[in-house]
Each structure stands twice: as C-alpha cells, then as structure tokens.
C-alpha cells in the first residue's frame, strides 16, 4: 500500500505550484511542459477545457480564456464561458484538478488530500470557496494556510532550533502581503500581518504597457489599444521586459507585425532602460513600504529585531524592490529560496506534518481583525483581539438589559473601532427561551471559535436552561487587505474620539443600571434603612437622572462615584440589619443588592 501523500499547493493569482514531501524533503513537481510553475489560466474552446501554459497562450486570441480568477473567490460573481456561467471556485477547481492530475502521474498513484495556501487577508468566504474548489477537484483540503506563513515554514525547516524573528515580503502577481513571524523550537507564530490586496506584479507590467502604448503612438503612429490582439501581445511582452530588467540594465522590446499602419505592417523595436523603468514604477514601490512599517508596529518590534527578511513572489527579483527593503529595514533580504516556489514548499511541509512524514514543526496563524459582539449602548465588546493565534476558542458571560427579557440578539462584528456601528457586521442571530428574570441575572455564555482554516463559529448559550444557538460566519462579500488596512487606520485616527463616545455610552449605561437597581432595592427594602439615609439616596438618584438628561459625562462620573459610595453604605446597613434579624430572606435580599452594585 502506497504511503499517504498530501499535496502542497500554491493556488496563485497568476501562477500555481504543487509540491510534495519525498524522503522527508520538499520537492516541486514539474508540469507536462517541464515547468515548475503553471499559469492559473483556464480556456474553453470547442467544448474543450484547457488549463495552464496552453490556456495562457490563448489569452491573445480566445475571449473565453479566464485568468486571475482568484480575485473573485468568495464573491457571488460569475464568469461566462462555454455557453454557461461559472462560479469562481469552479474555475479554480479546474486548475486544482490539473495540478492533481499531473502530480499523480509523477507520483505514480492517486492522491486525494492537499494543503492549499491563501493570502493572509482572505476572509471566511474566500477560504470556504478555496476549500470548495478543492472538493470539486476531488481533493480533501486538510488545511488552509496563509501564504507568508507557508514561506516562513519552508525557510525554517532546517532552522527549528534557533529562535528568530522573520519578516516575509510577499509580492505576488495580484496581491501583496507582509507578515512578521517568530520561529522558536519548531513553532511558527504569526505576530502581525499587513498588505494591499490590489497590488502585485501585474501593476508593474501595466506601467510598461502604458509606456509601450505611448511610444508606439509617437513613433509608429499606431494605437495598440484599438487592436485587442496587439494589446494582448503588449501585455505579454511587458511581463518579459520586467523579468529581463531584473537581470540586465536594458531590455529590447521586439514586436514584429504588431498591426497594419498607413505604410504597411508595423514592426516595433524599442529599448527600455532599467533606470527609466524604476522611475515609472517608483510609486508602486512606495506603496509596499507602508505595510512593512505597519507590520513591524503591530508586532511591537523594531527593524533591528529582525533576524531574516524573506522574499516571496517572482516580482521580488526586481532590484528596486530589494533595494527599498534593504533601505527601509537596514537589512539585506534573504535570496536563498526560490520566490516562485517557496509557498508551495511550505504547504508541502505542512502536508508532511499532517501525514506524519515530518515532526517537530508546529504552525500557528493569526486572525487579522478583532472579533466581538455588540453590547448595550452599541459598544463593540471584543472577544478575540486582532493578531490572536489560531485555532482559538474564547468565551465570555453576558446578561440581559431588561427585566423579564426572554430573547437576546447576538450581533457579531469585526474591526478595531470601539462602537459596533463603525465596524463590519458579520452576522446576527437570536437566542430565545431565556427564563424570565430581573435584568443582569441570566447568564448567557457567548463563545467564538476560529478553526485552523480561519473559519469562525459563534454560539450563545443560556447557562440555566441550556438553550443554545450557533452560526458559522460565511460572508458572501470579501474584505480586501486594502479595506482591512483602512479599518485599522481609521481606528487609529479615531481612537481618541471613539474613546470619548465609548466612555459616554458606558457611563450612561452604568448610571441607568445603578438607578434601576437602587430604586428597586429602596422599594423592596426601604423600611430596613435609616430614613435620612434613604432621603439622601433618593436625592442623589434624582441628581443623577438630571445629569443623564443634560449628557454631562464628567459630572455624571463624579455623581456616580458619590452614589455608589452611598449605595455601599446602604448595602452595609441592610446587611447589618439582616445579621441581627431572625429572618433568613432578609439576608438573602441584602446579598442580592450587593451583587447587583458590584456587577455595574
């Protein structure tokens, strides 16, 4: 019986790679064309499906050739081809099936399991879509792991004894991620993540395309944008030029028979210098600098604390990228690993760990944004802070806001703002059947659980009745890295204003709760206390109500402190009377009052 092999797959926006563990070492598998990377392109022609290199060649001529489908994963968008609409996961499944097929030929037997990588900022919907794509392709997805984490895993395989902090700079074809990880004793823990979901090597290609269009218009009196085939050829040549300029100072662009001009066929010959290319793409380089700084800040470390800087993605071969990284971090990036293959290698290593082929390696990912629920007054109460290591389960006890409340609504929010309305609403559900009781008495346990694939489950349980409701968060709308970074930035910019709003709401809730409890206590036990003390307490309660109407938070806080002191005296007096009384219920009443005051 053949030993279990779990494929490690980098399902990329531009290219995909598959690797396995062989003799406890990762091996990247070549596709039928002898290449170690496969274009993530699917084409349909005459009811035939074509994947990979052959499909990429049809991008020029076939309108039903589909590229960059990864950008649509987790959305409800579809692509039209072969006289039908395809969901993004269906197209991704065809790429995965192709990788699976040629991997099986190399291995010599069927393979049914895989570890697939995704960008660090893929949300629940995108991760679920990736798992579904694997399922459609006939693969059981054992684990979804973040691409930068996989890269660090590949790099750290032979260095598990040394403690180190690593920054992973991942510039792919369509996405950009920065992660800071800590490696220690075989454990890989993500300290922070940042990035830009709308930045990648394609943007550098597009700058060259724009330059070519302008030059061809000026020198050849021909507009390539007017000819679809000509424009597609420009895009292909732009990618080649970018690659060439990573190794040489000048690259020649040769495009014979690009189109027909006034005087016959147009044969383009142009030269692009690296210095000129770097000047026209300097703004793109700058866009990758801020996420580096943000990732370090989130990890609470300085650049000088980094032991290694890893490069992931073919675009990191550009000298300007490496120079910027070295200048920003004052450290040369490590170029010892193949940036195109390292993510798949890391996925294969994780597969090897799951299959028992590799031991002493533990992978820990994090959640990119804070998760919590909306509580009284519209406050966003966090349960799992951002950058918490996953898998994780956290619980907290909440209660009712009204007397005899038999149902509560659990609103799940994601984000860094202190008010629920300023964050992203992920889902909402009701817990019914709560036993009627005074406000604050029922115990409702809210639990958040994030599994190894980053999928979130939220439950609410009435501790007394045992009634429970659970939802799994599966957003149909994606949250891009750009949106996440914007949310974090907005939280930082509004931190002071949000804190004031939160303080006002919490003070109001605190005051209303205390008034409610004390008025009830005075009604129930007023005969047990001194009339003067009771009169003073009632006067302070009225002053508190007046301040609530005037919305004066600072004065309200001072009055709260005073009334809480009076309430404490009230509780002590009641307790003393209960101790001297022969009636046990009186003692029970005093304890209840004391507990209510402490609760607020």
From Swiss-Prot:
Protein's UniProt name:
Chaperone protein DnaK
The protein's job, in short, is: Acts as a chaperone.
**What are the TM regions of this chain, as residue ranges?**
none
Q: Where is the composition biased (Low complexity)?
A: 569-578
Residues found modified as Phosphothreonine: 175
Recorded GO molecular functions are:
ATP binding; ATP-dependent protein folding chaperone; unfolded protein binding
What Pfam family is a match for this entry?
HSP70
User: Matching InterPro entries, A to Z?
Assistant: ATPase_NBD, Chaperone_DnaK, Heat_shock_70_CS, HSP70_C_sf, HSP70_peptide-bd_sf, Hsp_70_fam
Q: Which PROSITE patterns match?
A: HSP70_1, HSP70_2, HSP70_3
Q: Which PANTHER family match?
A: HEAT SHOCK PROTEIN 70KDA
Protein family per UniProt: Belongs to the heat shock protein 70 family.
Task: State the organism named in the record.
Answer: Mesomycoplasma hyopneumoniae (strain 7448)
Query: What triggers or suppresses the expression of this protein?
Result: By stress conditions e.g. heat shock.
The protein's UniProt keywords, in alphabetical order, are: ATP-binding, Chaperone, Nucleotide-binding, Phosphoprotein, Stress response
Family matches, as HAMAP family: DnaK
User: Where does this protein have compositionally biased stretches of type Basic and acidic residues?
Assistant: 583-600
Q: Which CDD domains does the UniProt entry name for this protein?
A: ASKHA_NBD_HSP70_DnaK-like
Q: Which SUPFAM superfamilies match?
A: Actin-like ATPase domain (SSF53067), Heat shock protein 70kD (HSP70), C-terminal subdomain (SSF100934), Heat shock protein 70kD (HSP70), peptide-binding domain (SSF100920)
Q: Where is this region: Disordered?
A: 569-600
Annotated signal sequence is none
């Amino acid at each position: 019986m053949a030993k279990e092999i779990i494929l490690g797959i980098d399902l990329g926006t531009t290219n995909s790679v598959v690797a396995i563990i062989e003799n406890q070492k990762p091996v990247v598998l070549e596709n039928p064309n002898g290449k170690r990377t496969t274009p993530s392109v699917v084409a349909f022609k005459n009811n035939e499906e074509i994947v990979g290199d052959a499909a990429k060649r049809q991008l020029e001529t076939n309108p039903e050739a589909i590229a960059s489908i990864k950008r649509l994963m987790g959305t409800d968008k579809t692509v039209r081809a072969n006289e039908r609409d395809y969901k993004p996961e269906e197209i991704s499944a065809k790429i995965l099936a192709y990788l699976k097929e040629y991997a099986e030929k190399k291995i010599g037997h069927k393979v049914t399991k895989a570890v697939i990588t995704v960008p660090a900022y893929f949300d629940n919907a995108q991760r679920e879509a990736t798992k579904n794509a694997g399922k459609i392709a006939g693969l059981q997805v054992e684990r979804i792991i973040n691409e930068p984490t996989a890269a660090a895993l590949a790099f750290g395989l032979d260095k598990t004894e040394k403690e180190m902090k690593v920054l992973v700079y991942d510039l792919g074809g369509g996405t950009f991620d920065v992660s800071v990880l800590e490696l220690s004793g075989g454990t890989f823990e993500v300290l922070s993540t940042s990035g830009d979901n709308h930045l990648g090597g394609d943007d550098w290609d597009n700058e060259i395309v724009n330059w070519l269009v302008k030059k061809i218009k000026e020198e050849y009196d021909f507009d390539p944008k007017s000819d679809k085939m000509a424009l597609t050829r420009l895009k292909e040549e732009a990618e080649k030029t970018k690659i060439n300029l990573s190794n040489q100072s000048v690259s020649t662009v040769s495009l014979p028979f690009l189109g027909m001009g006034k005087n016959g066929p147009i044969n383009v010959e142009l030269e692009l210098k690296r210095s000129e290319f770097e000047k026209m793409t300097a703004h793109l380089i700058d866009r990758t600098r801020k996420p580096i700084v943000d990732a370090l800040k989130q990890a609470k470390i300085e650049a000088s604390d980094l032991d290694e800087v890893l490069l992931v993605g073919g675009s990191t071969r550009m000298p300007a990228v490496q120079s910027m990284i070295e200048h920003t971090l004052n450290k040369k990036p490590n170029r010892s690993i193949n940036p195109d293959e390292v993510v798949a290698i890391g996925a294969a290593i994780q597969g090897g760990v799951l299959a028992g082929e590799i031991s002493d390696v533990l992978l820990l990912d994090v959640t990119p944004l804070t998760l919590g629920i909306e509580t009284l007054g519209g406050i966003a109460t966090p349960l799992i802070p951002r950058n918490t290591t996953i898998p994780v389960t956290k619980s907290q006890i909440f209660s009712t806001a009204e007397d005899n409340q038999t149902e509560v609504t659990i609103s799940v929010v994601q984000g860094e703002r202190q008010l629920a309305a300023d964050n992203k609403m992920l889902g909402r559900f009701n817990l019914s059947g709560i036993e009627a009781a005074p406000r604050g008495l029922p115990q409702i346990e809210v639990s958040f659980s994030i599994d190894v694939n980053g999928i979130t489950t939220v439950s609410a349980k009435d501790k007394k009745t045992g009634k429970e409701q659970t939802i799994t968060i599966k957003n149909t709308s994606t949250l891009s890295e750009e949106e996440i970074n914007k949310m974090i930035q907005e939280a930082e910019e509004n931190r002071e204003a949000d804190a004031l709003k939160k303080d006002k709401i919490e003070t109001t809730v605190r005051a209303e709760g205390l008034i409610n409890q004390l008025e009830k206590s005075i009604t129930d036990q007023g005969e047990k206390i001194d009339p003067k003390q009771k009169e003073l307490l009632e006067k302070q309660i009225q002053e508190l109500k007046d301040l609530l109407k005037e919305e004066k938070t600072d004065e309200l806080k001072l009055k709260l402190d005073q009334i809480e002191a009076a309430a404490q005296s009230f509780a002590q007096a009641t307790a003393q009377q209960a101790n001297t009384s022969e009636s046990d219920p009186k003692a029970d009443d005093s304890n209840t009052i004391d507990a209510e005051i402490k609760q607020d």
